[in-house]
């Protein structure tokens, strides 16, 4: 198992993004307040750090690092569909469910979204309630709000 920490830009709700990988790709991304483990890097974590730096510098709006999330077949379908939500836009859970084949999938889509182990890279923050309200985000609604504002306003918060 490999671990790497990314220092987030000033004003971001958490000081670090913790990246976890195995030999096949990134398996986890979460937002943390402190460094809890000694870093042990590999090519996947280093590529992820590079892409996060580019994202926060306004040079990247999607990620190409190799991902290897653990989940059910349906969860993985949802997570890959999340990658189709354009940068700077939001979809409702219903829109995401329809894109997956049925509006009846809303609850299942919400559950899969909540279990996304690679937050930000798999952009589950771009999913909102049908009424436009921010709902559910494993990293916290403060982070979800920050990311949506950052993407909507043209990367005006560059690390610099």
For each predicted feature, which ranges?
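Basic nucleic-acid-binding alpha-helical/helix-turn surface characteristic of O6-alkylguanine DNA
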Residues: 1-104, 150, 154-160
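Short Lys/Arg-enriched helix C-cap and helix-to-coil transition segments
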Residues: 120-127
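…primarily DNA-binding HTH/wHTH and HhH modules…
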Residues: 130-160
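Regulatory, non-catalytic segments
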Residues: 107-116
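Gly/Ser/Thr-rich beta-alpha loop segments that engage phosphate groups in nucleotides
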Residues: 73, 90, 103, 112, ...
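Conserved SAM-binding loop
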Residues: 98, 120, 136
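Short clusters of hydrophobic/aromatic residues that line enzyme substrate/ligand-binding pockets
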Residues: 63-67, 109, 134-137
């Amino acid at each position: 198992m490999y671990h790497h920490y990314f220092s987030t830009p000033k004003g971001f709700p958490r000081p670090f993004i913790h990246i976890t990988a195995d030999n096949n790709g990134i398996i986890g991304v979460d937002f943390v307040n402190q460094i809890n483990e000694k870093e042990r890097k590999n090519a996947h974590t280093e590529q992820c750090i590079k892409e996060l730096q580019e994202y926060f510098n306004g040079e990247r709006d999607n990620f190409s690092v190799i991902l290897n999330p653990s989940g059910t077949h349906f969860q993985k379908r949802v997570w890959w569909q999340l990658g189709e939500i354009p940068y700077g836009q939001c979809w409702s859970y219903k829109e995401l469910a329809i894109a997956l084949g049925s509006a009846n999938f809303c609850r299942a889509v919400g559950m899969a979204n909540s279990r996304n182990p690679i937050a930000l890279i798999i952009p589950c923050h771009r999913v909102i309630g049908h009424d436009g309200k921010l709902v559910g985000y494993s990293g916290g609604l403060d982070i979800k709000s920050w990311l949506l504002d950052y993407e909507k306003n043209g990367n005006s918060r560059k690390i610099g």
